[in-house]
């Protein structure tokens, strides 16, 4: 079991590392490529577009050919794309590399969740996904710090050499440590309830959890996207203050994420999901009424706590009905989350909504819609249970 957890964590970490590690070098990258920082900020959207593109195909391929091949190819693509970014001499080539980085990270991301669905029952899966969320919260803090330390002595290209090395490590783990987890067969008693036809993506429960997780990701990505403007321009923080604040928010996320598995032993998953949305609603109201930086910071901490306590539980419930189509289900969730959050951020920018109002709007909207869905759509207890996986290969 440890090998699956290790590989799943490594596969997921490529996604946030690809977002956060290069940001500290953005001014130098822009100068060397004769582009403005504003022009290169589109690299974030390009990266997410690459992820969404990979997710369109990775899940189905993983269900048909196995998790391991997709993980290996995704890691190789991420590694090669990182090298392409490091060799870029102009903006379009750099953005092409960023798109391909997203493709590699997206494939690995989908496989990680499919592996956890294959190998864990619902109760343990919710706990592990909460821990995984806590570990990924470390990356937005450590990646910029690591990038800053690297750039003290080396050029910005070294940031992408580091990401390329991460791709190599993940590829080696996938090749030599990861075992195939795709179910080879099901017992006859499970065929009727776990056939591909029975595991339809168009059912009320899956769609409800897809909506909840998409709105939750939209909240956290809106916070990440709006945080520089909100903290440094609106609240007047320095770059150092900004870094400290983001470290504190990540710390809150880690503490809550690592505490959630213990909470699952005491409370029902639905209770934690309601607490999550209650924290989002409280954060939205707090930010809308805030007149001091202290109150605003408190509202931001509530956002991180709300996401951490509920996202893993909701993702576990969303994947629960799927054993034969875990890859497709994971892809669908990933695409919805990436595209939904990007659409909200883009629409808010087009409409000229301020950073604060953008954040307040998604917080209140997410909480109201999600609470209604949690109360109106309960888990279907007849869904397929976790299967013991007959390993197809020991390689």
UniProtKB/Swiss-Prot annotation:
Gene3D superfamilies: Multidrug resistance protein D (1.20.1720.10). Keywords: Cell inner membrane, Cell membrane, Membrane, Transmembrane, Transmembrane helix, Transport. It is a multi-pass membrane protein. Pfam families: MFS_1 (PF07690). GO terms for cellular component: plasma membrane. The chain crosses the membrane at residues 4-24, 42-62, 69-89, 93-113, 131-151, 158-178, 217-237, 247-267, 271-291, 295-315, 333-353, 358-378. Its main location: membrane. It is found in: Cell inner membrane. Residues 1-3, 63-68, 114-130, 179-216, 268-270, 316-332, 379-395 are cytoplasmic. Residues 25-41, 90-92, 152-157, 238-246, 292-294, 354-357 are periplasmic. Coiled coil: none annotated. GO terms for molecular function: transmembrane transporter activity. InterPro entries: MFS, MFS_dom, MFS_trans_sf, Multidrug-R_MdtL. Belongs to the major facilitator superfamily. DHA1 family. MdtL (TC 2.A.1.2.22) subfamily. PANTHER family: MAJOR FACILITATOR SUPERFAMILY MULTIDRUG TRANSPORTER MFSC. This is Multidrug resistance protein MdtL. It comes from Salmonella paratyphi A (strain ATCC 9150 / SARB42).
